[in-house]
Amino acid sequence: MPQTTALIVIDAQESFRHRPYWSEADLPGYVARQQALVDGCAHRGMPVVQIFHVEAQGPFSLASGNVRTLEGLSIEPDATFHKQYHSALAGTGLMAWLVSRGIQRLIVSGIRTEQCCETTARHASDSGFQVDYVSEATLSFPMRHARSGRMYTTAEIRERTELVLEGRFARIATVAEAIEGAAVSD
């Protein structure tokens, strides 16, 4: 039976280390869970797709040398795409790649929880894909609300993302649930 689920690893790249908000606080747990997800999906024959965010200048430029897999992760992707927008499905060729392979379900993971990962999950859902959003295999950083000045923790950001995606755009899944769900659905 052909594989109909693909893992999407979004922006797990060295570029982020050069942003002022970079923090190592949640990094070890993220790397462990992301690697477990990559390994589990690859072991089950799911295509693993790696997405890199690319900009013309700065740490996200190809010339910077930072558009490469985040240290600590080992990913052997079946396909790699460069994006310039928040959604991995916008302007990358990823949509055509998925459709041509009969992919119906996406497992979304990577960096940042509330930005490119959430945007990709919404876009994928609206495009007809089933989506498993593995929030424990996403990474973000504390953020300050511009108007109120309140600082939001990564746990609060993750919870908010789960709240707005669950049941509308995605199934919120753990690493194990996402891998097992693929085994059941395929």
Regions found by a protein language model. Give the residues of each.
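N-terminal nucleotide-binding beta1-loop-alpha1 segment
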Residues: 7-12
